[in-house]
Amino acid sequence: MAFSMLPSIIVDALTDLTPDFLAERGIELLMLDFDNTIVPYTTDVPEPLMEQWLYDMKMSDIKLCVVSNSKNQRVRIFCKNYGIDCITHAKKPFPKGIRECLRKYGLPAGKCALAGDQIFTDTMGARFCGLTAILVTAIDNHNIWLKARHVAELPFIFFARNRRINHEES
């Protein structure tokens, strides 16, 4: 199969993904990017809706694991506080952290998805490893570099526009 940089699915927010939506697609493990996917870069405190989503997902049959490029201790502390496994220093888009997660859970790539806000790290990493790639709208583009990166991603989002899932459909 040819490699694609297009996401498999696009959602406006991580909280639009439901356990039923993922299970219907055969997803048993959802890997999550951390910064700008779960919380903004500028805080460690999730919004109440995100906090409820994390709780609901943990109560479901879908396993969660944060796979982050961050070397910052805040990711580990957050995950410990919320009872979520995490892999830091993941080096996305390279397969290191994603493969580590696959080994940890003993699941094939076809039963896993990675949700994140960046095409050039999260989507590419998921696609390199054969996972379902879920592009999430970034929580906050608080600086010029994040805004520039998202502008560079617009052509990919345009070509994948028919993969957008509305909240009502999930």
Predicted regions and their residues:
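Asp-based, Mg2+/Mn2+-dependent phosphohydrolase catalytic module
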Residues: A2-L32, V39, T43-D44, P48-L114, ...
